[in-house]
Amino acid sequence: MGKYLGHFMRVAFISGTSIVNSTLFSSWEVRQVETPYGRVAYKARGDHALINRHGYGFPLPPHSINYRANIRALADLGFKDIVSLNSVGSLKPEIPPGSIVSCSDYVCLQQGPATFFDTELKGGAPVIANNLIPLLVARLAPEFTIPTAKVYVQMRGPRFETKAEIRVVRAWGDVIGMTAAHEADLCSEAGLNYNSLALADNYANGLEGTEIDFAKFKDLVKTNQEKVNRLFTRMLEILG
């Protein structure tokens, strides 16, 4: 079992397409759980579980992901601590492609929040708990240097942002993606601790006058696959 500050813990991971291409979790048992929002497939080993947010069949684009089912599944399985890895574009020159950062806040204005409260008058201010991030950042160093307290800007997807959109949102945050804000919203409502890790696959469209080179983007995604495998290997060692 993983042990943190003297307490045994169970940790669930949420990741994306890089996990589908990884052999790291090939020996984990595939299971399914029913939720009020649909069935969720996940992988499990010991005290840990892994959800591929895009699914294990035909990968769902970001705007079609069943976020409520994914988070409800983890809550129903008894997990409290969630570590999420999200692919992002960098909005800052000082966060080059290949960087891993942790976000402590987010902006999600295009779609509005994800919520479980369709028939209840409930609200509250969502947070990214990041309760495991200090441990992970300290223990992953010096192999991984992970800047913290970054701001995640969420757009709907599945297309990349226009240059004009990037000019607007550069002042809003540090990285841009399509998934983390909804997960953080729902984890807050469900009482789960959401821990943010974000891996930059590219500079955002038009940053410093550049355009996205999709050939280079695909090559970097492949290169980042090795980094993702190593990151999860180390996290599993740290968390037990």
Regions found by a protein language model. Give the residues of each.
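Active-site rim beta-loop-alpha module in soluble metabolic enzymes
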Residues: 128-171
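His/Asp/Glu-rich mid-to-C-terminal helical/loop segments that flank catalytic regions of hydrolases
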Residues: 205-240
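Metabolite-binding pocket within alpha/beta catalytic cores that recognizes anionic/polar moieties
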Residues: 4-124
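Zn-dependent metallopeptidase/amidohydrolase metal-coordination segment
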Residues: 178-216
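Generic hydrophobic/aromatic pocket-lining and core-packing "Φ" positions
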Residues: 71, 166, 181-184
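Flexible, glycine/proline-enriched loop segments at strand-loop-helix junctions
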Residues: 56-61, 118-131, 154-156, 170-174
